[in-house]
């Protein structure tokens, strides 16, 4: 299959992975019924294909009112009660988004079949996966998954928690939240403070606190976990005063609250773009919001599709200050955390999706200065920093392949690695932090990706959810199966005890001043001081050089 044919499917992989299971008919527990604060819900008995493992699934449970009409661009409100027994056997609507990024024919070619899921603003639902033996009083650990997708795409039903729930005896909850403009648009004032998607996540966590006991979960043992923008969400909840007490552990996979593209102190740029695209010639925020609430779904979707990525904002409530300030001031209540990255975050999928016009494979020593100058501007750095980036990452090498590899490393460091290390350093003095670098290149990608790609963005998700046991006919090795089982065990141990270690697993040391971390590969091992030189460059050397540059420019102006 040519690489371009795989783009749609890999877009889905970047935000998550579809792990479908087979529904089976049966007696009694085949139609489990559970209570919630707003009514009863009926689920399904599900067997993971080719195993005797059974789980109960409850799909499409509302945790808030539909965010439509006057509730568009407003905080979520508690769901309305219902009478009778609600059907929880079909997937909920996914939130309004550019569904072209979710893949189509390419999924079928890989024997991956997306369920036919409709799209609607009425999308604030969650899915629950519970071991079939669980009942009220089982007090199982709860793992709440927040999907990624640049805060613009994704859905809960791409992630099937059945294998993780059944093999590790945990309750898995996958939640949805408003995306794109509908989820994160802000006017910067009281008329639309923004972060609606984050507020949806808070509402879902409150629902879990109130109701998960009826599904066999322990509300006092909740771990939130997510990847990419989902990891950013998790990290943002750690520092948000609105989320305190709603969870007790946090797992951040390739995403933290200070990712440069997913947090902004100002909403001005997005505000201006939306105002122009909408045709709402508003003289003030109040009239703009009135106009936007009057748009239909198709009109809002057209605006949404302009944004491949959209940032959360400092809104004064969910995020009283920039996350970096909140961490530096210790103005938060940290919980034990697993934080990690993959060793090739900008290897292939992200440049393919986010910046297809930039042909990394065309970089040479001759073209590099212009490329780095442009890249520095995109990073919100002075263009003169291009020379510093060249010196740090490329040195004097002339070899194009080496230059291209170093460029990809530089982008991955800036976007994911350095922010993750910064957050780990902030948090480790207040609560245990376990850091990892995922290093395994999945074998089933060997025919679809360039050979230089290692562990790309999103690759670990397959293993976290036990991909090889789902209804997926992809080749995998025995070693990969063992690695998947180890990762699920680490994650579930952490959810259960706040510590990933247990007998039979390679030891994972806490990240302290020795800077130890786990190298997650077929043969896991302990590393030390991950990217110490690069961390020094991005957090000390580069800021100092920028200050010197500004000082020089100021003196030049005075002359």
UniProtKB/Swiss-Prot annotation:
Intrachain disulfide bonds: 95-123, 280-291
Active site, UniProt feature: 228 (acyl-ester intermediate), 345 (charge relay system), 457 (charge relay system)
Family per record: Belongs to the type-B carboxylesterase/lipase family.
UniProt modified residues of type Pyrrolidone carboxylic acid: 27
Function of the molecule: Carboxylesterase that catalyzes the hydrolysis of pyrethroids pesticides. Hydrolyzes trans-permethrin at a rate about 22-fold higher than cis-permethrin. Also hydrolyzes trans-cypermethrin. Hydrolyzes retinyl esters.
Gene Ontology molecular function: all-trans-retinyl-palmitate hydrolase, all-trans-retinol forming activity; carboxylesterase activity; trans-permethrin hydrolase activity
GO cellular component: endoplasmic reticulum
E.C. number(s) listed in UniProt: 3.1.1.88, 3.1.1.-
Post-translational modification: Glycosylated.
Location in the cell: Microsome
Predominant location: other
InterPro entries: AB_hydrolase_fold, CarbesteraseB, Carboxylesterase_B_AS, Carboxylesterase_B_CS, Type-B_Carboxylest/Lipase
Signal peptide: 1-26
Origin superkingdom: Eukaryota
Organism: Mus musculus
Residues with attached carbohydrate: 276
Enzyme class, UniProt record, top EC level: hydrolase
Catalytic reaction annotation: (-)-trans-permethrin + H2O = (3-phenoxyphenyl)methanol + (1S,3R)-3-(2,2-dichlorovinyl)-2,2-dimethylcyclopropanecarboxylate + H(+); all-trans-retinyl hexadecanoate + H2O = all-trans-retinol + hexadecanoate + H(+)
Keywords carried by this UniProt record: Disulfide bond, Endoplasmic reticulum, Glycoprotein, Hydrolase, Microsome, Phosphoprotein, Pyrrolidone carboxylic acid, Serine esterase, Signal
Record's protein name: Pyrethroid hydrolase Ces2e
Modified residues annotated as Phosphoserine in this record: 552
A Pfam family of this chain: COesterase
């Amino acid at each position: 299959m040519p690489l371009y044919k795989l783009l749609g499917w890999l877009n889905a992989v970047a935000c998550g992975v579809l792990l479908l299971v087979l529904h089976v008919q049966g007696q009694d527990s085949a139609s489990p019924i559970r209570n919630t604060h707003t009514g009863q819900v009926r689920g399904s008995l599900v067997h993971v294909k080719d195993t005797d493992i059974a789980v109960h699934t409850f799909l499409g449970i509302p945790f808030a009112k539909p965010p439509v009409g006057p509730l568009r661009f407003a905080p979520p409100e508690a769901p309305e009660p219902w009478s009778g027994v609600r059907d929880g056997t079909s997937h909920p609507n996914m939130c309004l988004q550019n569904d072209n990024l979710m893949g189509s024919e390419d999924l079928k070619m890989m024997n991956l079949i997306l369920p036919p899921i409709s799209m609607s603003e009425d999308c604030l639902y969650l899915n629950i996966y519970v071991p079939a033996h669980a009942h009220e009083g089982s007090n199982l650990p709860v793992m709440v998954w927040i999907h990624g997708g640049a805060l613009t795409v994704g859905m809960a039903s791409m992630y099937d928690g059945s294998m993780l729930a059944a093999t590790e005896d945990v309750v898995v909850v996958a939640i949805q939240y408003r995306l794109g403009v509908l989820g994160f648009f802000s006017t910067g004032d009281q008329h639309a403070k923004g972060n609606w998607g984050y507020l949806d996540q808070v509402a879902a966590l409150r629902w879990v606190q109130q109701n998960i006991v009826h599904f066999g979960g322990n509300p006092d043992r909740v771990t939130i976990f997510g990847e990419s923008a989902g990891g950013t969400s998790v990290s943002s909840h750690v520092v948000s005063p609105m989320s305190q007490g709603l969870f007790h552990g946090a797992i951040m996979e390739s995403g933290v609250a200070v990712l440069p593209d997913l947090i902004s102190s100002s909403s001005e740029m997005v505000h201006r773009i939306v105002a122009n695209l909408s045709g709402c010639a508003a003289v003030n925020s109040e009239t703009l919001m009135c106009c936007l609430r009057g748009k239909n779904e198709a009109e809002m979707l057209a605006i949404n599709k302009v944004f491949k990525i959209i940032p959360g904002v400092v809104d004064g409530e969910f995020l009283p200050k920039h996350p970096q300030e909140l961490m530096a001031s210790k103005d938060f209540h940290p919980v034990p955390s697993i934080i990690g990255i993959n060793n090739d975050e900008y290897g292939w999928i992200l440049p393919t999706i986010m910046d297809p016009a930039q042909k990394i494979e065309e970089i040479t020593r001759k073209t590099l200065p212009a490329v780095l100058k442009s890249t520095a501007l995109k990073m919100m750095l002075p263009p003169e920093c291009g020379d510093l980036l060249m010196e740090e990452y490329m040195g004097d090498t002339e070899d194009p392949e080496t230059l291209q590899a170093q460029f990809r490393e530089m982008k991955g460091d800036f976007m994911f690695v350095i922010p993750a290390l910064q957050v780990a350093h902030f948090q480790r003095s207040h609560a245990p932090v376990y850091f990892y670098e995922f290093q395994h290149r999945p074998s089933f990608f060997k025919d679809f990706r360039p050979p230089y790609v290692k562990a790309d963005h999103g690759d670990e998700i397959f293993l976290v959810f036990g991909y090889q046991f789902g209804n997926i006919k992809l080749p995998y090795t025995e070693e990969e199966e063992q690695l998947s089982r180890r990762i699920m065990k680490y994650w579930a141990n952490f959810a259960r005890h706040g510590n990933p270690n247990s007998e039979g697993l390679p030891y994972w040391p806490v990240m302290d001043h020795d800077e130890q971390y786990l190298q997650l590969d077929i043969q896991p091992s302990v590393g030390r001081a991950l990217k110490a030189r690069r961390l020094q460059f991005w957090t000390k050397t580069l800021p100092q050089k920028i200050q010197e540059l500004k000082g020089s420019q100021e003196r030049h102006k005075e002359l």
